[in-house]
Amino acid sequence: MKLRGVSLAAGWFLLALSLWGQPAEAAACYGCSPGSKCDCSGVKGEKGERGFPGLEGHPGLPGFPGPEGPPGPRGQKGDDGIRGPPGPKGIRGPPGLPGFPGTPGLPGMPGHDGAPGPQGIPGCNGTKGERGFPGSPGFPGLEGPPGPPGIPGMKGEPGSIIMSSLPGPKGNPGYPGPPGIQGPAGPTGLPGPIGPPGPPGLMGPPGPPGLPGPKGNMGLNFQGPKGEKGEQGLQGPPGPPGQISEQKRPIDVEFQKGDQGLPGDRGPPGPPGIRGPPGPPGGMKGEKGEQGEPGKRGKPGKDGENGQPGIPGLPGDPGYPGEPGRDGEKGQKGDIGSTGPPGLVIPRPGTGVTVGEKGNMGLPGLPGEKGERGFPGIQGPPGLPGPPGTAVMGPPGPPGFPGERGQKGDEGPPGISIPGFPGLDGQPGAPGLRGPPGPPGPHISPSDEICETGPPGPPGSPGDRGLQGEQGVKGDKGDTCFNCIGTGVSGPRGQPGLPGLPGPPGSLGFPGQKGEKGHAGLTGPKGLTGIPGAPGPPGFPGSKGEPGDVLTFPGMKGDKGELGYPGAPGLPGLPGTPGQDGLPGLPGPKGEPGGIAFKGERGPPGNPGLPGLPGNRGPMGPVGFGPPGPVGEKGIQGVAGNPGQPGIPGPKGDPGQTITQPGKPGLPGNPGRHGEVGLPGDPGLPGPPGLPGIPGNKGEPGIPGIGLPGPPGPKGFPGIQGPPGAPGTPGRIGLEGPSGPPGFPGPKGEPGLGLPGPPGPPGLPGFKGTLGPKGDRGFPGPPGLPGRTGLDGLPGPKGDVGPKGQPGPMGPPGLPGIGVQGPPGPPGIPGPVGEPGLHGIPGEKGDPGPPGFDVLGPPGERGSPGIPGAPGPMGPPGTPGLPGKAGASGFPGAKGEMGMMGPPGPPGPLGIPGRSGVPGLKGDNGLQGQPGPPGPEGEKGGKGEPGLPGPPGPVDPDLLGSKGEKGDPGLPGIPGVSGPKGYQGLPGDPGQPGLSGQPGLPGPSGPKGNPGLPGKPGLTGPPGLKGSIGDMGFPGPQGVKGSPGPPGVPGQPGSPGLPGQKGEKGDPGVSGIGLPGLPGPKGEAGLPGYPGNPGIKGSMGDTGLPGLPGTPGAKGQPGLPGFPGTPGLPGPKGINGPPGNPGLPGEPGPVGGGGRPGPPGPPGEKGNPGQDGIPGPAGQKGEPGQPGFGIPGPPGLPGLSGQKGDGGLPGIPGNPGLPGPKGEPGFQGFPGVQGPPGPPGSPGPALEGPKGNPGPQGPPGRPGPTGFQGLPGPEGPRGLPGNGGIKGERGNPGQPGQPGLPGLKGDQGPPGIQGNPGRPGLNGMKGDPGLPGVPGFPGMKGPSGVPGSAGPEGDPGLVGPPGPPGLPGPSGQSIIIKGDVGPPGIPGQPGLKGLPGLPGPQGLPGPIGPPGDPGRNGLPGFDGAGGRKGDPGLPGQPGTRGLDGPPGPDGMQGPPGPPGTSSIAHGFLITRHSQTTDAPQCPHGTVQIYEGFSLLYVQGNKRAHGQDLGTAGSCLRRFSTMPFMFCNINNVCNFASRNDYSYWLSTPEPMPMSMEPLKGQSIQPFISRCAVCEAPAVVIAVHSQTIQIPHCPHGWDSLWIGYSFMMHTSAGAEGSGQALASPGSCLEEFRSAPFIECHGRGTCNYYANSYSFWLATVDVSDMFSKPQSETLKAGDLRTRISRCQVCMKRT
């Protein structure tokens, strides 16, 4: 079977083979001849058809890389790529070039007056200057007021008992006194010894009594019985003046003083006294005003640095009570208390209690309660004066309580003096004041040794006050005392003498002049209480008394005490109630749009960026598709919703404190525990804005949502405020976050062109300068541009007296007028002296006017000083005057940057005159003025007694107010020091108050929200703590001038300061319009500069001192002023023609270049004065010009130093000379004569020479003329409180002051209980005049009373008829002894002007006058004959150093020197810097001197100064971020107080990631260390300029290798460099930032504007080809930096 299958298969095969092989055979056997049988077995067939492709094979192994192909052709420019995301912010570029100066800004409005600055540090005492020359004697000043009484002299030795009977020297006759009132008859004296009989005379009528003689000697010690009181005699006529007789004192005769006579009738009232002291303050003080409206929103303050939030401290324990404070100032007068109960009636012992007539006005009781305020009544006419009441002595009433001190009452009209009956006699009073010496008595012959005592004359008026005597010398010691029991035993009182006969009445004499107050007499025994007199006028306020006894009357309010000394610090207070919210800040600017953020890996914490400002919320968009996107930004605060329903009542709170009476808020209690969280109520009303939280940290980026972002929707409208969320639990205390880094400091900018700042506070008064020269009268110039606000000018001259004006009420300020101010008119005729006006009420403060045109009028001629008139009262404010003269130049200010001039502003109104300033120092004597018109003849009055207070001035009913209503809110106070920056809150509507929670700890800061809507201005918050001084801001606008403050207490004069050193000359300031300054000292001669144009001819100056005789030059006459021409366009400079009329200022042309000096032109005539041009901006300070050419003249003989003459007008620079070679110095010639002025030269270039050296101190000048009285200066700042002085003597009454402000209302005291009888109170207020009383019965004749004091001066009596002639008296012998010098007489009238005197003798030659104008160039003279040899001159100044001479010939060979020392003694110092924190080792062969820190360079005042790193100066032994300070010429140094820098080599220490500045100890790892080494030989650095290390020269050894460091710059593109031969140019390590910048505020950091410069590699083949630009990145930096090696010469 198997075999069958095989054969069958073979058969099938053969069949197929046969079928297939037929065509093959045919093909194989092709070519066989037909009929022949071909054998085709085994022949290869033809190529078959291509098969189907096979399956893909497996990839083969990678082949080897082929060779690099050639570079392909440059491809086409590709399409623009899609815009990439914004790159990071680039580093700050270098500062750009300074821009062109901007156009001048308009002048700003005047700024507010700044608050007085703090008191400066007292300067050092200056060195004592040399004694100056004595000045000329000044004119006598006005007579000053009498000085205070001197210190009592030392007690003299006891006087000797002189038993001599010789009379003293006779005094000069005094002035006759006025007639006195006849006194009562004196007691009859003892009969004298019988004199020799006189010649019989006829009996004459009794003569009038004589004037009182000098005090008689003591009477004999006999006492008689007291006689009855005599009737008052009629007034006797004045007696004729007698002559002083020589009186011999009886030996051992003692006189007893008699009883005092009866008091005289009360005289008529005296003349009104001087104006009394200022009355009490006006109306009652109103109640406290309501809270003022909140002020406008202020400008945003500067950002302060964020402080780290501190944890609130616990309240401290109460401290110990402080020391008692100083006495407080006297408080304001309290309200008058209620009336007390009547006092007890204490009957007088020994007398019955009979009710007498109504007594005088009792002491004022306690005031009643305050009534309602009535309307002010119309002032009634003064009532008629009532007659004096009867003086029946009633029993004294009970003493009342001491009343408060009453206010000063109005002075009543003088009463009609109806004399009453005489009262009862009082006890003898105290001895009166000692009267002046009387006139001389009649002569008595010397034979009459004892004179009878005549009847006493009437008391004389007080005499004139004598001059202040000098303190007497200590007297001689007295003889031994015979009666030494104390002060002597008084003898018994003598009997009163018999009453004398009444004299006939004399005629009334003329009234005498009022006498001066006499000296105080000795204190007598205290008399009994006299009859109560009529109420006297109120006295002057007394000085402050000693503290009185404490009266324990309840309810009495004491006066406010003096200001106490500051007490010790009190206990720390408990926390106060929270303050009110501050004002919201301004909204910040809009921030930059952010990029599309894709979620990245969380990176390292970045530097804290500045917080971005939130953008506005966009409008609502359509709903996007896809999953929700990230949380959107917070929208703008929506409109407040309607109030919700009241919430569910919360849990019951802790019981509140029961307050029975509304009091002040109590101390806050301890915080309660947290209650359970209640259910959230419905939303309440929006609450007040809370304090802002601390910004939270930025959250993690959220996971990005899946889905395509939708298109941004439109901005939605503000949503309605949602309900508040549930309250969270209190968070834990957060960790203290790191403080953010300060920003990079910007480069120091160019000086800004700022507007002038507001005027500073008034400077200290300067020293009195010398008088400047008198200027010419100029023509009025066009209005100049307004200059800077000047310092307060010196007081202007006193104006003429205006016409008598009626005092009108102050009108409202008028609107400012518009118009150019014309030149001042001629002075008006002086008007009559005005009547005293009322004190005007200060007007409302006017708005500040815009600045006016500063047109300067021509200066007037100096007037003659008039005779000083009596000071008039203060008149009403006059109309604004014309602008005064410009003030004298102030001291030079600090050097300021030049501001641009602004266009003139419109004129503003004049301000209100300020108060009187502190009197200035007495000026030097002025020159003799022209004689003024004769003034009215005034009589010199002696100093009068302080008069009684005058009647009150007329009161305007509009001004006299009763108690005012509650006042308006006060002006805002002085702004406090700006506090720390507050956060900006969102103002909301006020909500219902919540319960006070426990203060939470600061939570984590959230993301910054959008700016809220601006809230209402909050109430003014409490002043913050004083912040650190911020950067100087731009000058603010000048504020409104505040009301004048109260005058400060004058401080004690300070000790004189040391004179400062002379400062450098500043840049020229803007040419202001002012008086010429004081002439400066003569400087050293500078190089001859280019001459300027000739100036204006000056008017005739004051006569100078005689100069050396010269040939007078031709002086041109001043021409008449021409008419101004129209402004011309700037044309090319023509030939100098004759001077034309001054044209109006033309348009400014372009600045031309400096021309070459032209040849001197012919001398022209002096032109008319041109008009003042507008001052241009100051040019840049030029380089010093080339020395002018010209042959120097021979130096003159040195003159003696004369007195400084009056300053001449400024000289005009002369024409330029031709350039000539420098001549040899000639012999000293004599001074040349003054030549005529030269012609105007071409203008020189506007270059400014260099600063000259300070000249020597010039001799003092002559005293200038006395200036006029200046206007009062501004009120100075209030001085420091002085120490409490000792209690002074009672001063004279002051001038009436203006009505004071109403005081604060005091509390009403409760009525007091009835107290014990008090001591007598103060005098009560003057009562209304009573009705005339009925005359009483005549009283019984009482015992003899003591004589009353002299009544007031009576009215002048009529001149009586002359009496009959008296009989001739006995002829006496005149013994004339010269008396003492009498008091000075009344000054006589000024005499007539005397005739001119004869010419005086020839005066001494005057000092050399000022140099004259330069003369025109003369023709060259012929050679003169050789003069004789002069005397040897004074030694000249040392000459400048000469040029080096040629080398001299070779010297002879010297002897061999001594053996040399070891070469190591000649060490060379080098410095090696490690650039690490470890100090380096000194190289082999050198010795270390010291270690230190590597200082690279410093920068101060924008200028850098570098150190050579190879020298020891670059290795400071101590490190400081500010190792230097700066000093100025004023002996003041400042340290770490400016924007200065220091730069130090640094280490490879990496900066922290935050890049915040390094402070404190964290700076140390960044500062490189260094070592100073001593090498035995010279050390140099060699540089290869390749990357190979160079070899040391032959014979030199290597010390170290490094990189070639060349230069470095940083802030402000300042820096320094290294000498390439110095070892400092070869740093051992290369770093792109090899140094670090440190500042005076104690920080260091790396900054992007710091660059280091390294020597680069140079290929030999590229030495002279263009360098190819190349940028090297990190890693390749060292491939282009040259290498170097430091080598030391072998020794």
Swiss-Prot record:
Q: Where is the composition biased (Low complexity)?
A: 52-61, 133-142, 413-433, 786-797, 882-901, 983-999, 1007-1028, 1103-1120, 1224-1233, 1301-1311
**Record region (Nonhelical region (NC2)):** 27-41
In this chain, composition skew of type Pro residues spans 62-73, 193-212, 266-281, 434-443, 683-692, 868-880, 1139-1148, 1234-1243, 1359-1368, 1398-1413
Consult the record and explain the modifications the protein receives after translation: Prolines at the third position of the tripeptide repeating unit (G-X-Y) are hydroxylated in some or all of the chains. Type IV collagens contain numerous cysteine residues which are involved in inter- and intramolecular disulfide bonding. 12 of these, located in the NC1 domain, are conserved in all known type IV collagens.
Disulphide bond pairs: C1482-C1573, C1515-C1570, C1527-C1533, C1592-C1687, C1626-C1684, C1638-C1644
- Its predominant location is secreted
**What biological-process GO terms show up in the record?**
cell adhesion
Q: Which SMART domains did the record assign?
A: C4 (SM00111)
> By its UniProt entry, which Pfam families does this protein fall under?
C4, Collagen
For this UniProt record, the keywords arranged alphabetically read as follows: Alport syndrome, Basement membrane, Cell adhesion, Collagen, Disulfide bond, Extracellular matrix, Glycoprotein, Hydroxylation, Repeat, Secreted, Signal
Where is this protein localized, as stated in its record? Secreted, Extracellular space, Extracellular matrix, Basement membrane
- Which portions of the chain have biased composition (kind: Basic and acidic residues)? 246-257, 285-305, 324-333
Region Disordered, as annotated, extends over: 49-548, 566-1465
Assembly and partners are described as: There are six type IV collagen isoforms, alpha 1(IV)-alpha 6(IV), each of which can form a triple helix structure with 2 other chains to generate type IV collagen network.
> Anything noted about its domains?
Alpha chains of type IV collagen have a non-collagenous domain (NC1) at their C-terminus, frequent interruptions of the G-X-Y repeats in the long central triple-helical domain (which may cause flexibility in the triple helix), and a short N-terminal triple-helical 7S domain.
Annotated function: Type IV collagen is the major structural component of glomerular basement membranes (GBM), forming a 'chicken-wire' meshwork together with laminins, proteoglycans and entactin/nidogen.
Protein name from the UniProt record: Collagen alpha-5(IV) chain
User: What is the originating organism of this protein?
Assistant: Canis lupus familiaris
The gene for this chain is COL4A5
